[in-house]
């Protein structure tokens, strides 16, 4: 069953400066494509109203109607393999790909490559726990800041998905509670509840796709959206969770979808997360859309 088949790893040791630094897992994947999927126009009732059947936070309320224009979105989040191409093409060194705020963040923090990546003997590796992995797998690119994702988009001449578009495809064009229908999320439908302790290949969990074939919208990694985090119309502070949202309006960037270590009750297309655009330590990645002609 492809939902439970995982990449085979081969092991060898590597020495750096005459010291054993780790066991490398050499990933021998067949690289998959990441095609764009056409999404028709429609309407979305974005956000939530009070519902006793699930936990709802104040930043989801209240719902409002949005018209969605036709767009084309990547089937999967951008993979490690795809992002490696950006790195190899001097994406971190070419100022033309970086916005003003992104450039300031990159230079101030001396960002020269993705977090946890190492360049050894002209080969890129990624560290995770006690292992070092060859970079270039079908895993989703994660631990990536909004600024880095923005630079990738500029280099590739694509754009971020926006928050309304993301919720639209994650609710089957506004028709269901989840991409796969109305059933609650489980470990069989998406990578959640920390079952596998890390993200998995983007081509797994076919049964969790939406009806258009967009994959892994729930779980595995959070996904950056284009917008700054702002309240919905008629927002009212929930004083039980009063520190969750309003202190960060106008500062953080939206991210959606949950990740492998998020509980099922927070894995929902309406749930809004937000992080600083320079955040790299969270398991956040991104998917992209074609620019309108």
Residue ranges and their predicted role:
Residues 282-293:
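Short, structured beta-strand segments at or near domain termini in extracellular proteins/domains
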Residues 1-61, 91-270:
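Functional-site microenvironments in short loops/helix caps that host divalent-cation chemistry
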């Amino acid at each position: 069953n492809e939902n439970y088949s995982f990449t085979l790893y081969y092991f060898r040791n590597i020495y750096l400066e005459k010291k054993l630094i780790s066991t490398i897992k050499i990933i021998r994947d067949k690289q998959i494509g990441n095609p764009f999927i056409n999404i028709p126009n429609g309407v979305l009732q974005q956000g939530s109203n009070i519902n006793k059947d699930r936990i709802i936070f104040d930043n989801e309320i209240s719902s409002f109607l949005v018209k969605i224009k036709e767009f084309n979105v990547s089937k999967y989040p951008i993979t490690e393999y795809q992002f490696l191409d950006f790195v190899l093409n001097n994406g971190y060194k070419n100022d033309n790909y970086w916005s003003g705020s992104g450039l300031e963040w990159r230079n101030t923090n001396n960002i020269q490559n993705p977090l946890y990546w190492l360049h050894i003997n002209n080969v890129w590796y990624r560290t995770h726990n006690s292992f070092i992995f060859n970079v270039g797998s079908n895993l989703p690119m994660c631990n990536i800041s909004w600024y880095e994702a923005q630079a990738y988009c500029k280099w590739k001449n694509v754009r971020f998905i926006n928050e309304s578009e993301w919720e639209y495809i994650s609710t089957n064009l506004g028709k269901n509670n989840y991409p796969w229908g109305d059933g609650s999320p489980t470990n069989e439908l998406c990578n959640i509840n920390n079952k596998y302790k890390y993200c998995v290949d983007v081509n797994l969990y076919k049964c969790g796709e939406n009806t258009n074939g967009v994959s892994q919208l729930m779980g595995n990694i959070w996904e950056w959206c284009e917008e700054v985090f702002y309240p919905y119309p008629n927002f009212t502070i929930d004083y039980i969770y009063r520190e969750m949202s309003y202190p960060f309006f106008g500062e953080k960037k939206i991210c959606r979808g949950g990740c492998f270590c998020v509980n099922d009750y927070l894995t929902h297309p309406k749930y809004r997360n937000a992080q600083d655009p320079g955040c790299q330590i969270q398991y956040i990645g991104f998917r992209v859309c074609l620019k309108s002609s």
